[in-house]
Amino acid sequence: MAKLSKALLERLGVAAVTEHANKSETTLRANIPVGDKGISFDGEIEVFKDDTESVQSLIGRVPVQVKGTQVQEFTAGNRTFPTGMDHFQNYYNSQGVIIFVVEIKRNRESKVFYKQLVPTEIHGILQEYGIKKGQGQRRIELRPISETDLASVCIKFMNETKKQPLMLIENKPFEREDYTSYEMTSLTFDPSIGNIFEHDFTLYGVKEKLTVPLDHFRIDALKSEIIETIIIDGVSYELFIETTNMEKEVILLIENSLELNYTIGTSKFDFKLKRLHSLAAQLKVLPLVLDLLTGRNVEFVQLGWTFDLSVTEKEREMSKTYKRLYRTMLQLKEVFQQLDVDETTEFGDETIERNKFINQIDIFNKMMLEDDRSNFKVEFPEEAKYIGFNIGGMKFILFYDPYSKPIFTNAFSQNISNKRISVIYNDVETPYTPYTLFDSQSLVCSCNVNITVIKESFNRIDPFVNDEVAYISNDFCLTCIHAFDLSQNEDFLELADYIYSKYQGDTLTPEILYINQTQIKKRREGELSEADVHRLFSIKQEHAGDIGMNFCTSVLLESKVEAKLLFDKLSREEQERYKAFPIYKLYYDMTATVLV
């Protein structure tokens, strides 16, 4: 290919850009001299409101650089071009530039490509590739002008650069959490015709009327959530799917469990069980998997996909494995019904190897459905007791009785709550509830805990009948308050309040009872009534010498400095004891940011 001279390429390049300016419906005036170029910039394009080209009609000026390059054939799609870091710095200092690369054939035909370089993008290039990586140049990607028009390119550039003052880019005046909203813009993306993965975007943080440029990026993936209908050989499944769309691949996460990968343009897909997630998820996806392994045709209705399926020997073997897993999950469904556990409860920790995880479920099923404890060790197996069992992150509380059938039962079933348990005090046996044996962690973390059953168990006893029983009941109420602090489940506050409502005697110190009831109210409502404040103040006056009681009232009255002074007066042992009480949570939250 005979080479054209650099001077000719320059003239032809400028002429091609000028021709686009002259043909624009919006009045553009290209001031791009030939042979007398400045440093980094070749000239400018003026944009006018009308064709008078008067002072009054001038909208603005766009700095430009034009590069002519000879080619044998025009580039299809986008093309790249190298630019030095020193030029990037000059572009940044001048608030951006539009670069034109004009491909020119031997016969003088030309094709114009453009790149709008705005300050946020240039700043990122200088920081990442110039300063951090020490590169001397960086290739930029240019788009064909034929996909748009020069006036639109210039006007969008001017509007975008106005939103990107260098002071905001460099100083980052706010933290991310300070912005009330975010907005995203693109100079080139047209949703009706464009591939979003081929375009650049700028992210702005919005604070009141100010928009602050935060980042310039290209989208790698788009996530969305849909309810999809999948039809396999006429059998229909309606499933929740998280879709991740990438330039060449789509990943579906079905019911947070089954991952399906499809390479765009092919006729096949792969799938795997990424995680178990929950029993509900498995009861939905495993029948789907079995049909995928044995079916002939599958249609994804909303996505518009249709695939022909084939059954290989490998898939037949996989089908056997998934059938066993499905049987295991159906058995677990029966166990969950016994334990009154929600099937949508997530299994939680799935970091252990998949087969070991499933083995845990098999052991649990055999314990609950077959009284088989051969794979579960019970200490002192001759004694009836409450025991715990874990599946991943799920925790269950069971009642174990070696002399009954079944051996393992739900600790919160009506049969268990009716079992006789007693508190012996001064040789007097008093009927009591078994549920005060559980600590706050067990109440919060065990997925078969039934607060209604616990509450009803207190209806069959007097929880404050004597000093010992009252002490246990009060301690359990504090456990319930702590359980609320761990979980934010207000049912625990209601349970504690309900138990306290049964108090009628003289087995508790009235002031302690009132402080604990006020703790519940403080957590529920966030504030106290005027009557509460007066009552707490009276308690402070009546018990001026009781440091612990004064500490509690000061916390509830939000006397931050006084509460800290009183806590510091407690002995080290007393401080450790109070740290285990729910009142300390209120104290800690109140004083966490207070310096004394």
Annotate each PLM feature:
Residues K115-K156:
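Compact, glycine/acidic-enriched structural inserts
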Residues M1-A21, T161-R176:
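General N-terminal leader/first-domain-start detector
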Residues I140-S257:
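Charge-rich interaction segments
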Residues V101, G265-L279, S473-F484:
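Short, hydrophobic/proline-enriched secondary-structure or compact coil segments at domain edges
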Residues L4-P82:
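Catalytic centers of nucleases
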Residues E238, E242-D342, E346:
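Extended non-globular C-terminal regions
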Residues I59-G124:
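Elongated alpha-helical scaffolds
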Residues V301-V596:
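Long, low-complexity regulatory tails in eukaryotic proteins
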